[in-house]
């Protein structure tokens, strides 16, 4: 069955925003990230950055355990389809394939070099095919076989008085033996009704137990004990004819001593996947083989069981490459599977790199595919062709993670660990900057956290700009100003402040802008923000009853010609309110002492300044109105593109002019009276 197919991609890496990976798979990738980070921590604390065999094995087992947990969760999952439309069973089959490959690479790579390869492969087979019913898809079928096949057979046979009378009993025994699963064969033989009294059965059980012990002992550097036991079996069958009354026990003996005809006969009968029985073939016929001899051994095996290399699926080709100790070819097949295998290839290559950095050097891996990473790398470095496979895979995987709205946060870990230095940081800067946070301010804040952690200046400014503009469109001017203040430039701060001064929010709301309480000296360089801060202070002083101080600040705002006309209208309204308050008894004064009911005191020069400012503003408004009326009939002013388009339509301009004129007419006599009172004082 073709497992690595670009038609069956996992959701990670899907270019479609609607295609998201299954929640269980997402948890798996988070688990892998935690193990990845742990591996980096271990490598950094070791001289040379190379993880010892024991450490690499521990990390490898953790990766495999994470895949197995995901498989168990999928078995318990009720949904038949993932959110990307993928069949849950199909996803389970893919994870089974990856589990099989990872454990096989672990068996042939993270092992003492002096150990016999046959024992490591037998352990791999026993772990992956515990019932010899493959946990991965059969080559002959399109469905997962029952992983508890042997347990089901045993449960049925236990209820029978004579299990050996049933064909399924001996089929199970011989199939287990074909795979060199001696423990299962021994267990099944014990269900034989005559087991306790039959000398041949007892003898066979003892032999199988001895074989099992001899193979999986602590010292795995030789198979002398196994060869001695096999010679003993030859003697029992040839000379003593111990098993002549038990045809099936005779088959077991024939397999054990390496009879090719028997092996082929039962392989053709049961038709298991070739890689399930290859470790047994290696034990029965070439137990002392080394890694260098494996290609020749496999050729003999394929000739015996009539398997053709050109008919192998991509999964089988990958397994074959690994068993032949051609791991580079195996990695090429894995990497060529596309995005579906990227997460698997990335973590596998990373672990191999830190176990032996020379093994995956750029020369050996230069021809290995790396998806879309190369194009991205080319845009950041002229020497990108010299980057090793690990770096290229980490970049590609990070790209894919940024395409999933719940996995993007872990992408930074991979880019920073890529060893690309400033190139990796610039790539991360671009990916964060281009990430679509869909107007979610919570996501934007998390992106900004990444920017601060890894000093991503460009991305930080882009996100803040987008955030400010979005809040302005939503009318959230106070929040927009708060985010604009976090930018390195004053451009947006100036624009947002000016729009607030022009009336984007009410004067009372300006007095509630608590962001000014936490400001430092950064607003000194922005005149618009200074005006806002002064007006905020003015409103706060009014609320606190500090009229004298409030009037002095209002005076400063009044004589500042940098503020927009709309803001002057606001100042007029505030001045009118204050002057009106002078004509009312002030709250809090003692009504029994009316002589103390005096105004807070308007300074003569202060009133004169306000009067002059009012006159100049009135004259300016008249000139602007005249120019607008005369120019409007002759030409239409070409619109200019601005960050915040001003509200400068003809109707709004006329309305504002009329409003300012009315306010000035109201304010002028009040200021005149206030000035007269000052002179009378």
Language model: regions and residue ranges:
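Long alpha-helical scaffold regions
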Residues: 1-7, 12-15, 19-61, 67, ...
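Short, charge-rich, low-complexity alpha-helical interaction segments
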Residues: 100-155, 340-369, 429-444, 505
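Solenoid-repeat scaffolds in large eukaryotic assemblies
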Residues: 184-186, 330-333, 345, 361, ...
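Extended alpha-helical solenoid scaffold regions that build the rod-like backbones
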Residues: 170, 241, 245-467, 570-571
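Short, charge-rich amphipathic alpha-helical segments embedded
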Residues: 192-216, 331-358, 419-437, 488-507, ...
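Long, acidic/serine-threonine-rich intrinsically disordered regions with weak helical/coil propensity
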Residues: 1-132, 287-344, 383-407, 420
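Extended amphipathic alpha-helical scaffold segments
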Residues: 156-214, 315-337, 395-419, 430-431, ...
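Short helix-adjacent coil turns
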Residues: 50, 54-57, 61, 65, ...
């Amino acid at each position: 069955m073709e497992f690595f197919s670009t038609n069956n991609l996992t959701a990670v890496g899907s270019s479609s925003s609607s295609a998201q990976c299954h929640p269980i798979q997402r948890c798996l990738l988070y688990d892998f990230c935690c193990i990845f980070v742990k591996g980096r921590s271990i490598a950094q604390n070791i001289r040379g950055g190379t993880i010892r065999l024991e450490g690499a094995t521990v990390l490898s087992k953790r990766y495999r355990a994470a895949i197995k947990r995901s498989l168990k969760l999928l078995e318990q999952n009720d949904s038949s389809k993932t959110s990307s439309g993928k069949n849950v069973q199909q996803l389970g089959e893919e994870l089974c394939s990856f589990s099989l490959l990872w454990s096989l690479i672990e068996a042939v790579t993270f092992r003492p070099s002096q150990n016999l390869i046959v024992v490591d492969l037998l352990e791999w087979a026993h772990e992956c095919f515990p019932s010899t019913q493959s946990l991965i898809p059969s080559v002959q079928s399109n469905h997962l076989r029952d992983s508890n096949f042997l347990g089901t057979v045993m449960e049925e046979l236990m209820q029978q008085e004579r299990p050996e009378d049933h064909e399924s009993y001996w089929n199970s025994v011989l199939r287990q033996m074909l795979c060199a699963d001696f423990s299962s064969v021994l267990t099944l033989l014990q269900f034989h009704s005559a087991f306790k009294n039959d000398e041949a059965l007892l003898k066979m059980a003892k032999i199988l137990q001895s074989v099992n012990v001899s193979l999986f002992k602590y010292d795995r550097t030789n198979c002398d004990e196994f060869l001695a036991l096999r010679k003993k079996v030859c003697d029992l069958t040839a000379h003593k004819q111990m098993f002549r009354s038990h045809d099936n026990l005779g088959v077991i003996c024939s397999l054990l001593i390496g009879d090719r005809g028997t092996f082929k006969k039962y392989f053709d009968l049961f038709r298991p996947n070739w890689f399930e029985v290859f470790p047994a073939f290696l034990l029965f016929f070439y137990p002392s083989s080394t890694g260098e001899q494996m290609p020749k051994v496999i050729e003999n095996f394929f000739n015996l069981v009539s398997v053709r290399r050109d008919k192998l699926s991509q999964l089988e080709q990958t397994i074959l490459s690994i068993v032949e100790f051609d791991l580079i070819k195996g990695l090429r097949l894995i990497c060529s599977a596309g995005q579906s295998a990227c997460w698997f290839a990335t973590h596998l290559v990373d672990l191999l790199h830190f176990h032996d950095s020379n093994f995956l050097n750029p020369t050996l891996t230069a021809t290995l595919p790396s998806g879309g990473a190369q194009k991205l790398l080319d845009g950041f470095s002229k020497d990108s062709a010299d980057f090793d496979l690990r770096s290229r895979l980490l970049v590609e995987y990070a790209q894919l993670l940024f395409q999933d709205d719940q996995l993007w946060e872990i992408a930074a870990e991979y880019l920073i660990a890529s060893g690309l230095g400033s190139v990796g940081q610039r790539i991360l800067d671009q990916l964060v900057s281009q990430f679509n946070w869909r107007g979610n301010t919570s996501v934007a804040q998390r992106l900004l956290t990444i920017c601060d952690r890894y000093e991503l200046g460009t991305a930080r400014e882009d996100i803040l700009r987008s955030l400010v503009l979005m809040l302005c469109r939503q009318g959230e001017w106070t929040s927009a100003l708060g985010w604009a203040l976090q930018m390195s430039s004053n451009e947006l701060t100036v624009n947002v402040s000016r729009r607030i001064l022009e009336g984007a929010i009410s004067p009372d709301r300006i007095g509630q802008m608590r962001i000014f309480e936490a400001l430092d000296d950064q607003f000194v360089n922005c005149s618009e923000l200074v005006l806002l801060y002064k007006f905020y202070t003015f409103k706060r002083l009014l609320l606190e009853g500090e009229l004298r101080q409030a009037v002095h600040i209002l005076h400063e705002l009044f004589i500042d010609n940098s503020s927009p006309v709309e803001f002057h209208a606001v100042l007029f309204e505030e001045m009118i309110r204050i002057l009106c308050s002078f004509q009312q008894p002030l709250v809090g004064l003692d009504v029994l002492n009316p002589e103390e009911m005096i105004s807070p005191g308007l300074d003569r020069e202060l009133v004169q300044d306000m009067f002059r400012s009012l006159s100049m503003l009135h004259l300016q408004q008249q000139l602007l109105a005249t120019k607008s009326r005369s120019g409007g009939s002759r030409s239409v002013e070409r619109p200019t593109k601005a960050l915040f388009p001003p509200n400068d339509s003809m109707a709004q301009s006329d309305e504002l002019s009329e409003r300012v004129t009315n306010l000035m007419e109201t304010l002028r006599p009040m200021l005149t009276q206030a000035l007269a009172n000052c002179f009378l004082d």
